[in-house]
Amino acid sequence: MAKQKVRIRLKAYDHKILDQSARQIVEAAERTGALVAGPVPLPTKIEKHSVIRSPFIDKDSQEQFEIRTHKRLIDVLDPSQQTINALMKLNLPAGVDIEIKL
């Protein structure tokens, strides 16, 4: 008999909100008796952009900006219907992207 697994990937620009959301998901799953693996921190994606400061000349004077995308992975092993209902009812903060695979 194959065991069922729910894989949850979280993405956010702010790591504090991301960790708070991961903690809420883990607590909700453990309250219903499911086994939880994680949250596992995945590599942070860093996008860097260089912009010329001057509107006309001076290519040498540039400003650098970066966007960091933090990611976490949570596996819920053998979820019951109660566990799935509890996860669906969670109210997570805005700014957190959630991807769920069964």
UniProtKB/Swiss-Prot annotation:
It comes from the Bacteria. The keyword Ribosomal protein applies. GO terms for molecular function: structural constituent of ribosome; tRNA binding. GO terms for cellular component: ribonucleoprotein complex; ribosome. Keywords: Ribonucleoprotein, Ribosomal protein. One of its GO terms (biological process) is translation. InterPro entries: Ribosomal_uS10 (IPR001848), Ribosomal_uS10_CS (IPR018268), Ribosomal_uS10_dom (IPR027486), Ribosomal_uS10_dom_sf (IPR036838). PROSITE patterns: RIBOSOMAL_S10 (PS00361). Pfam families: Ribosomal_S10. SMART domains: Ribosomal_S10 (SM01403). SUPFAM superfamilies: Ribosomal protein S10 (SSF54999). HAMAP family: Ribosomal_uS10. Belongs to the universal ribosomal protein uS10 family. Involved in the binding of tRNA to the ribosomes. This is Small ribosomal subunit protein uS10. It comes from Roseiflexus sp. (strain RS-1).
